[in-house]
Curated annotation (Swiss-Prot):
Name assigned to this protein: Fatty acyl-CoA synthetase and RNA processing-associated kinase 1
TM regions (residue ranges): none
Taxonomic source organism: Saccharomyces cerevisiae (strain ATCC 204508 / S288c) (Baker's yeast)
Predominant place of localization: cytoplasm
UniProt gene name: FRK1
Signal peptide: none
Known role: Putative serine/threonine-protein kinase that may be involved in rRNA transcription and ribosome biogenesis.
Note: Present with 556 molecules/cell in log phase SD medium.
């Protein structure tokens, strides 16, 4: 016999459908939405009403009991709702609200209500506070009638501890009363309602606003209109609260003429004229404390420190001994541990979905703005890129400069160039340490470039016409380009700065910064003898300060910057630095620190007045390999309008022979296309004579009697060794095939050299195969513009290598003598050069025809490629 189970339902009937057994109806979304919500909270019953609105009980609206515990409930909060319309027309009310919010954000004490967060939407501002489930302290006393002394002492000690913490933060409550005191679930006192909170200064803590509730406010607030001491007013309120706790009623309520206390004026007159009375059940010790606290004269009223030390509060002296700083540390420690512990989903206060720490309703959409009390915003510090040696000019913001996204209008720096530059900075520092050990006398060589510079090209986006570039020596690595500062490698060392102003030019990508390790050992010899020291009167830029456009180049002063010096031997073999600002030149790009490779192992500083060792960096130097450029030395007299160029035919021959003989086959540099002598205008005897006179005049100004002898010997010796070196170079060139780099296709733009005169417009153009595609349509040549380019720097090293030791010593003495005699002198870039001074050294050269043959020979060889 089969048996059928008949299960009874909750309404008393029965059914055979087992799917309906013990199934409670599920709430739909529409039923869930019937609850009144504010942000992520469901609003419950009204806890109380205040000046600005109601206080509602709240809890998370997406609560679900996921744990096994039956009594796991979300944390309840008290939400103080304030209508925005009620405060929009009264700025005083709005000030009170935000005062309360800001005060609670800075207060963290167990006896002060905790601010959870602040929410607001289009209608309400909601201040979310912790819920004190014990209720109002006033009702608690009414229920108990009065408290026993032991319990009263415990609660009063908590009140004093909280008030002392508030005062330690520079705040005063000014509205302490029983109605503003709450109890938590453990019957601990909680201070709330900071609507009248205000700040005070330790020097002047007097306040003028009369606030507070009747019977709790100090007499000085009501009777007198003078400023009052706010902390003493809070002490009076605490005394009234203590009296109500012990007696069960308020003091001075026995006036027969004002039994209800409705007449405030009469009440305070009665307070000032009547001594305090106590019921019989209040013991003498608490009476003594009350008599000291409830004194009409605030100057005679006891302070908080004396209250904490009173005999009646000794049982809680350990609690009262906790300082405000210790409360802060304790709260911070608890916060750290609370964040580190894995919290249950609803074990703590619900979070707003708009808050950064939100957990409660991240998926919910609501029209509210969250002001989290725990979020204190601080401005982010300026970010500094430590991976770039030279940053962008100040017109570009730091976030754009550090952005990983490449923009079309920005200079693209290759990673290899940055790596080479960073590595070379370390090498330069190492070389300086090695050179410093040699204890040689430093030679002061600073070259200042001034004058007019004319550019025919459009300004690049990376360099503005007002950008100032300052070159520093490896003694102190401070390089400023526009407004960017490179941190110094050695802060204690002196600084030598070389200034030059960049003119608008077309920008192009930087070309091939090749760093050859084989050249490092050779250049160490040069670095040991090269020093630059700064003038004591020159102001050094601060290495840690950075402000866009704040640095300007000081005007030229011969007393401030040391004069560019040159001796007689250097005139025959010296090389000059260039700023060859032509289209698609590597220097036209954003300034960066270019690597100077010197392949020779010469150690004589006298061989070149602008000798630059390996590993040195400067934004004032061209960013192309210096072996692939050439030029002539320009001698400029400060007061003269004519610039004389010292042209050395022997040096030119040697330079070209070195360039085309394949010496640089191990360096990835560009082939140089150089104009031949046939394209130069012929020299007249008058021009040669004028050039010779200008050289003789320069010799007279630059040397003293002792220096002239040594310079003549150096000149003769240099010419002898130059001739020997030319012969060796020619023999080597005839036996060696033409070597070139694949980068020679870019040689027309990246290493175009020599001095351009007004005859350059008639010059034959280079072959099209040597031209580089132009990136800018604004490229236009101007035949009236002239460029002074740097000569090959290794030539001076080669000459000085062959000089005997006595000659080098004499030249060094000559250089020091000239240093004391020389006056204003500098090397400049000019827009026009006097034709009469071109090739003035050709008349002195006995090998003029040989130079032409050599030049023609290598010219033909280069055209075969």
């Amino acid at each position: 016999m089969s048996y059928t189970n008949k299960r009874h339902t909750y309404y008393g009937g029965f059914t055979n459908d087992l799917s309906d057994t013990f199934q409670y109806p599920q709430r739909t979304d529409e039923q869930r939405r019937k609850h009144v919500t504010f942000g992520p909270y469901i609003l419950g019953s009204t806890l109380g009403e205040g000046e600005f609105g109601k206080v509602k009980l709240g809890w998370p609206k997406n609560f679900s009991n996921s744990s096994n515990s039956t009594f796991d409930f979300p944390k309840q909060v008290a939400i103080k709702l304030i209508k925005r319309d009620s405060i929009s027309n009264d700025y005083r009310k709005e000030v009170k609200i935000y005062r309360e919010i800001n005060a609670l954000k800075h207060l963290s004490h167990p006896n002060i209500v905790k601010l959870e967060e602040v929410l607001q939407n289009s209608r309400y501002i909601g201040i979310v506070l912790e819920y004190a489930c014990g209720g109002e302290f006033y009702k608690y006393i009414q229920k108990k009638r009065r408290l026993k002394e032991m319990n009263a002492c415990r609660l009063f000690s908590q009140l004093i501890s909280g008030v002392h913490y508030i005062h330690s933060k520079g705040l005063v409550h000014r509205d302490l009363k029983l109605e503003n005191l709450l109890l938590d679930k453990n019957e601990n006192l909680v201070i709330t309602d900071f609507g009248f909170v205000n700040e005070f200064c330790s020097r002047n803590e007097l306040m003028k606003t009369s606030c507070g509730s009747p019977c709790y406010a100090a007499p000085e607030l009501v009777i007198s209109a003078e400023p009052y001491e706010a902390r003493k007013a809070d002490i009076w309120s605490c005394g009234v609260i203590l009296y109500a706790i012990l007696a069960g009623y308020l003091p001075w309520d026995d006036d027969p003429n004002n039994p209800e206390g409705s007449d405030i004026g009469r009440l305070y007159n009665y307070i000032n004229s009547t001594p305090l009375k106590f019921p019989d059940y209040i013991l003498p010790i608490p009476r003594d404390l009350l008599r000291r606290m409830l004194v009409s004269d605030p100057k005679k009223r006891i302070n908080l420190k004396q209250i904490k030390k009173h005999e009646w509060l000794k049982p809680h002296s350990s609690f009262l001994s906790i300082t405000p700083d210790e409360w802060d540390k304790l709260n911070n420690t608890q916060s750290v541990f609370r964040l580190a512990k894995p919290r249950r989903r609803y074990g703590s206060r619900p979070q707003s979905s708009c808050s950064t720490s939100s957990l409660g309703s991240r998926s919910d959409k609501r029209d509210s703005l969250v002001i989290d009390s725990t979020l204190i915003t601080f401005p982010a510090p300026p970010q500094e890129s430590q991976n770039h040696i030279i940053t962008r000019p100040a017109s570009i913001a730091s976030d754009q400069r550090l952005s990983p996204i490449r923009r079309s209008n920005r200079h693209n720096r290759s990673n290899s160039a940055a790596s080479v530059a960073l590595q070379a900075v370390v090498n330069a520092d190492r070389e300086y340490v090695l050179s410093h050990e040699q204890s040689l006398s430093p030679v002061q060589n600073i070259r200042q470039t001034t004058g007019n510079m004319t550019a025919s090209l459009s300004p690049p986006p990376a360099i503005s016409p007002g950008d100032i570039i300052i070159e520093t020596t490896p003694i102190k690595r401070n390089t400023i380009s526009g407004s960017s500062i490179v941190p110094s490698l050695e802060e204690e060392s002196s600084t030598t700065m070389q200034t030059s102003k960049i003119q608008p030019n077309n920008m192009a990508s930087s070309q091939n910064h090749q760093y050859n390790k084989n050249k490092t050992q050779n250049s160490l010899q040069s670095a040991k003898n090269f020093y630059r020291t700064s003038s004591s009167s020159h102001t050094k830029p601060r290495p840690t300060s950075y402000h866009p456009g704040s640095y300007t180049t000081p005007p030229y002063n011969s007393n401030t910057l040391s004069i560019y010096e040159i001796n007689e031997k250097a005139k025959s073999s010296a090389s000059s630095q260039t700023l060859n600002q032509r289209d698609t030149s590597p220097f036209d790009s954003t300034p960066y620190l270019a690597l100077d490779t010197c392949i020779t192992s010469s150690s004589s500083i006298e061989s070149s007045p602008k000798l630059i060792t390996h590993g040195q960096f400067s934004v004032a130097k061209p960013s192309v390999d210096l072996q692939s450029v050439s030029g002539d030395l320009i001698k400029y007299k400060r007061d003269a309008d004519v610039v004389t160029r010292i042209y050395d035919e022997k040096y030119k021959q040697k330079r070209k022979s070195l360039r085309y003989s394949g010496i640089f086959s191990d360096i990835s540099c560009d082939t140089v296309t150089e104009e031949s002598d046939e394209l130069r205008p012929p020299e007249s005897p008058l021009q040669q004579h004028e050039g010779q006179e200008s050289i003789d005049k320069a010799k007279t100004e630059d040397t003293s009697e002792k220096g002239s002898k040594s310079s003549n010997i150096a000149k003769a010796t240099a010419q002898k060794h130059v001739n020997n070196h030319l012969e060796r170079s020619l023999n080597e060139a005839e036996s060696t095939k033409k070597r070139f780099s694949f980068l020679s296709l870019y040689s027309y733009d990246t290493s175009k050299s020599s001095l351009y005169s007004s005859m350059d417009s008639k010059r034959k153009p280079s072959p099209p195969s040597q031209r580089r595609p132009k990136k800018d349509d604004s490229y236009q040549t101007n035949s009236k513009n002239h460029y002074i380019t740097a000569s090959n720097m290794q030539t001076s090293h080669q000459v000085s290598k062959d000089l005997p030791a006595p000659t080098m010593v004499q030249n060094k003495c000559t250089l020091e003598t000239k240093k004391a005699v020389r006056s204003n002198r500098s090397s400049i870039m000019v827009s026009e050069v006097n034709k009469a001074s071109v090739d003035n050294k050709a008349a002195q050269s006995p090998e003029h025809s040989t130079a032409k043959r050599v030049l023609g020979f290598f010219k033909r060889r280069s055209m075969k490629i």
